[in-house]
Structures are given as C-alpha cells and as structure tokens.
Amino acid sequence: MAKEDSIEMQGTIIDTLPNTMFRVELENGHIVTAHISGKMRKNYIRILTGDKVTVQLTPYDLSKGRIVFRAR
C-alpha cells in the first residue's frame, strides 16, 4: 500500500485488544480496529484508552487501519 493510496483520519482509542490491537472511534463516528505501525512499535510508543491518534485506512477495507501517530 503506497502512502498516497491511504486515507488518514483522526480518532480516539475506545478499547484495547490483545496483540497491540485497538478499537478506534473516528471523528465521523465509525469504529475501526487498528494496530500500531512498525515505527511506533520499535520506539515503544505507549497508547492508552482515550488517546487521540491518527489512523491510516486503506480504500479496500475501511474496517481495519494502522495507527501512525499519537497526539500529546
């Protein structure tokens, strides 16, 4: 998936799932399942319930995404 093919949206973590998966509520009200990107995992970025995050979605499956940024 090329970077320009993905859709980036803002959301809030509402639930933590096993294996570094999270349930994220997007700004438009949709709920998606997202995992942490490799660079965030490598740098040990901790994500907790209630954090504001940026999620990349692929146009092929809008129910799954990748967390690429955690807002402070």
Swiss-Prot record:
It is found in: Cytoplasm. Residues 1-72 form the S1-like domain. Disulfide bonds: none annotated. The keyword DNA repair does not apply. The keyword Acyltransferase does not apply. SMART domains: S1 (SM00316). InterPro entries: NA-bd_OB-fold, RNA-binding_domain_S1_IF1, S1_domain, TIF_IF1. GO terms for molecular function: ribosome binding; rRNA binding; translation initiation factor activity. Keywords: Cytoplasm, Initiation factor, Protein biosynthesis, RNA-binding, rRNA-binding. One of its GO terms (cellular component) is cytosol. Its main location: cytoplasm. One of the essential components for the initiation of protein synthesis. Stabilizes the binding of IF-2 and IF-3 on the 30S subunit to which N-formylmethionyl-tRNA(fMet) subsequently binds. Helps modulate mRNA selection, yielding the 30S pre-initiation complex (PIC). Upon addition of the 50S ribosomal subunit IF-1, IF-2 and IF-3 are released leaving the mature 70S translation initiation complex. PANTHER family: TRANSLATION INITIATION FACTOR IF-1, CHLOROPLASTIC (PTHR33370:SF1). Component of the 30S ribosomal translation pre-initiation complex which assembles on the 30S ribosome in the order IF-2 and IF-3, IF-1 and N-formylmethionyl-tRNA(fMet); mRNA recruitment can occur at any time during PIC assembly. NCBIfam families: infA (TIGR00008). Belongs to the IF-1 family. This is Translation initiation factor IF-1. It comes from Psychromonas ingrahamii (strain DSM 17664 / CCUG 51855 / 37). The gene is infA.
